[in-house]
Swiss-Prot record:
One of its GO terms (molecular function) is magnesium ion binding. Homodimer. Pfam families: DXP_synthase_N, Transket_pyr, Transketolase_C. This is 1-deoxy-D-xylulose-5-phosphate synthase. Binds 1 Mg(2+) ion per subunit. Catalyzes the acyloin condensation reaction between C atoms 2 and 3 of pyruvate and glyceraldehyde 3-phosphate to yield 1-deoxy-D-xylulose-5-phosphate (DXP). The keyword DNA repair does not apply. Transmembrane segments: none annotated. The gene is dxs. InterPro entries: Dxylulose-5-P_synthase, THDP-binding, Transketo_C/PFOR_II, Transketolase-like_Pyr-bd, Transketolase_BS, Transketolase_C, Transketolase_CS.
């Protein structure tokens, strides 16, 4: 389904930035209105990230109007806010396909467009990449400009400040636009600040500022007094001292929804030398009342009818694994005030809203700082607490050194509740939980569990709570659980023990995690033995030995990369046991998995029931 572009007469004239730059500046407010309306309608058709893009419409228009993209480099941090950028860079008609199998990518993606100068998906990467591009631009002497756009949420990550510290030291020409949509840094926005920003970015001010530095260079005492006076005067009206200390010239804050003010300020800043930061204030969900009132709820949305001002009612479904985790955490916190819940800024997604409200003194949001979150948990464990870190599989990668150095090395009893393990679907390769079993298996002292349903998930979390000899990881997928009736009684599993779910002949399927239902279909069709292994590490040695000595073929099934995954662990164990035999590893291939619906992807990868059966039959036929 496509949208009727005739309803957007100005937007129709701006399919690319080159066309946009041909428009008179006076029509830019109208263009912004049409762009916002088009975004609203297209996301209603496709689903996707929504509220962030509504807040960056005017900024996107102004950036492409002032800067000569793609020659000038524009890097978006994370990419949730980049839908307007996609619309203005030749992908307007494809927007209804975003995040769908075969459709355009959910984030800026280098393979998709020359305007996407850096592929993104995780937060905090833009300034590092922009700095490198700024250094390269100076080496080339081609007059290329570089801009990074980053949100105030991503500014909580340590990598951002590492990059800014380096940029301030190198002093290459670059602009960082701080899109502040939560009013977490400053509320000083209005006509005075807009005027001040244009004044401070103007040629007269910057010329006087730089010439004064040259004159005062030989008079250190007077120079220091002047510097302090300037900082004091600026500090009275702008919150930029921190950025100035990092070596950036700070401009702002200004209204990020005033496209004319943005254009004029960016024009001035385009010609400034050295690292610059422009602080803009925006409203997440701007222009659509429900999203303005509930920007978190409208951050990412399913398909909806914009005219109803409501998201579609959720279909009755089983609780999600995230909800199962959240309920378990509340149950445990009720019984034990030493239980602490930690999240790196994923409270809603990880199912921790109720916990944060009921147990505020036991809840810690570490912000978008995964390294800090892991070591925070380690510190709590040292003091006798029971820290539970709820973290997405793809984001735990960012705290890998801390997992090894600060947790596992010290055998600290931290519980890792790893959400979004396996295929996550529409968010694509930056968010698929494809590698956690592989990268955790290599770490000594780790206990790794993979539940097949919500009850096993609950019992495994409790097993982690009871285990004090080191860290435990419980890895579960995105989306609804299987619908098993909840078993209220919690019992810790014996570490490293699985169980046989079905007795068969010749073939034994060793399943790890929520692929159990699909593996069961294949086992029924093939009259195979089926084992629910439960533990990826340590493996159930006796069960593997028993299955290997009584079957002709072992098949491992997991929703993780085959390389280094649970199946690799089975092969390593068989080698140690000196039990050579045919083994078929079924899992994710050695490639980054593209976006699409989870069911579509699993079927394409032959990880559904028929696919597992087909892979086994093909192996036997060779």
């Amino acid at each position: 389904m496509s949208l009727d572009i005739t309803k957007y007469p100005v937007l129709a004239q701006a399919d690319t930035p080159d066309e946009l730059r041909q428009l008179p500046q006076g029509v830019l407010p109208k263009l912004a209105d049409e762009l916002r309306s088009y975004l609203l309608q297209s996301v209603g058709i496709s689903s996707g990230h929504f509220a962030s893009g509504l807040g960056t419409v005017e900024l996107t228009v102004a950036l492409h109007y002032v800067y000569n993209t793609p020659f000038d480099r524009l890097i978006w941090d994370v990419g949730h806010q980049a839908y307007p950028h996609k619309i203005l860079t030749g992908r307007r008609d494809k927007m209804p396909t975003i995040r769908q199998k075969g459709g355009i990518h959910p984030f800026p993606w280098r393979e998709e467009s020359e305007y996407d100068t850096f592929s993104v998906g995780h937060s905090g990467t833009s300034i590092s990449a922009a700095l490198a591009m700024a250094v390269a631009a100076e080496k080339e002497q081609a007059g290329r400009k570089v801009v990074a756009v980053i949100g105030d949420g991503a500014m909580t990550g340590g990598m951002v400040f590492e990059a800014m510290n380096h940029a301030g030291d190198l002093h290459n020409d670059m602009l960082v636009v701080l899109n502040d949509n939560e009013m977490s840094i400053s509320e000083n926005v209005g006509a005075l600040n807009n005027h001040l920003a244009q004044l401070m970015s103007g040629r007269l001010y910057t010329t006087i500022r730089e010439n004064s530095k040259k004159v005062l260079k030989g008079m250190p005492v007077i120079k220091e007094m002047a510097k302090r006076t300037e900082e004091h005067l600026k500090g009275m009206v702008v919150p930029g001292t921190m950025f100035e200390e990092l070596g950036f010239n700070y401009i702002g804050p200004i209204d990020g929804h005033d496209v004319d003010a943005l254009v004029e300020t960016l024009r001035n800043m385009r010609n400034l030398s050295g690292p610059q930061i422009l602080h803009i204030m925006t409203k997440k969900g701007r222009g659509y009342e429900p999203a303005e009132k509930d920007p978190i709820g409208w951050h990412a949305v399913p398909k909806f009818d914009p005219s109803t001002f409501a998201k579609p009612a959720a279909k009755p479904a089983n609780p999600t694994f995230s909800q199962v985790f959240g309920r378990w955490l509340c149950d445990m916190a009720q019984k034990d005030d030493k239980v602490l819940g930690i999240t790196p800024a994923m409270r809603e997604g990880s199912g921790m809203v109720e916990f944060s409200q009921r147990f505020p003194n036991q809840y810690f949001d570490a912000a978008i700082a995964e390294q800090h979150a892991v070591t925070l948990a380690a510190g709590f464990a040292c003091e006798g607490y029971k820290p539970v870190l709820a973290i997405y599989s793809t984001f735990l990668q960012r705290g890998y050194d801390q997992l090894i150095h600060d947790v596992a090395l010290q055998k600290l009893p931290v519980i890792f509740a790893i959400d979004r393990g396996g295929i996550v679907g529409p968010d694509g390769p930056t968010h698929q939980g494809a590698f956690d079993l592989s990268y955790m298996r290599a770490i000594p002292n780790m206990v790794i569990m993979a539940p097949s349903d919500e009850n096993e998930c609950r019992q495994m979390l409790y097993t982690g709570y009871c285990y004090n000899e080191g860290p435990t990881a419980i890895r579960y997928p995105r989306g609804s659980a299987t619908g098993e009736p909840q078993v209220e009684t919690m019992t810790a599993y014996e570490i490293g023990k699985g169980l046989i779910k079905r007795e068969g002949k010749k073939i034994a399927i060793l399943n790890f995690g929520t692929t159990l239902a699909s593996a069961s279909q294949a086992a029924e069709a093939l009259d195979a033995t089926l084992a629910d292994m439960r533990f990826v590490k340590p493996l159930d040695v006796e069960l593997v030995k028993q299955l290997a000595t009584s079957h002709d073929l072992l098949v491992t099934v997991e929703e993780n990369a085959i390389m280094g995954g649970a199946g690799s662990g089975v092969l390593e164990l068989l080698q140690q046991l000196k039990l050579p035999m045919p083994v078929l590893n079924i899992g994710l291939p050695d490639e980054f998995i593209k976006h699409g619906e989870c069911g579509e992807i699993l079927a394409e990868l032959q990880l559904d029931g028929p696919g597992i059966e087909a892979q086994i039959r093909a192996y036997l036929a060779d």
